[in-house]
């Protein structure tokens, strides 16, 4: 069993105290109790853990550690984080990112480049934010992967980003036709499946 999170955007809305309280309530009252009740010991985060690319507010960082990260460590959760575009400082590389600078556990697995990860015999292709630095490796991984499932923080053409506004940048949906399931960030609340895509709610 694997828990999935994405687009948590710690520090959103200008580090709004109201949003911090709202997010904390979700983790304390819903998310972590669910992991315990269902004996889930693995978490995959599909990217955009934090909100700002350039910096993080001290209170937001403190809250992230106290409410989220310390609890993952307390429960001994095997944590995998796929870097999203909001997690990375530069636009052309994922190598300078918030997660590697927040002093989180050395046991956490952070993915800045495509990688195939095995969970109890099932291979899953992880695809972090595709940028100049990892573009060729990402395309090669997509084209040559033998996995049936891909997870990532993807920009794909043709999905509705906002009502009436369809994304015209990124990869073509057809590039993922080989996969039985592709799990990525939520785009359109009315479009749960599209050419094999399972769109994950934020």
Regions found by a protein language model. Name each.
Residues 87-178:
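Conserved catalytic scaffold of divalent metal-dependent phosphoesterases
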Residues 1-3:
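Extreme N-terminal starter segment of soluble prokaryotic enzymes
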Residues 6-9, 154:
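Short, small-residue-rich loop/turn micro-motifs
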Residues 200-202:
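Ligand/cofactor pocket segment of small-molecule handling proteins
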Residues 8, 12-116, 179-198:
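Core catalytic region of metal-dependent phosphoesterases/phosphodiesterases
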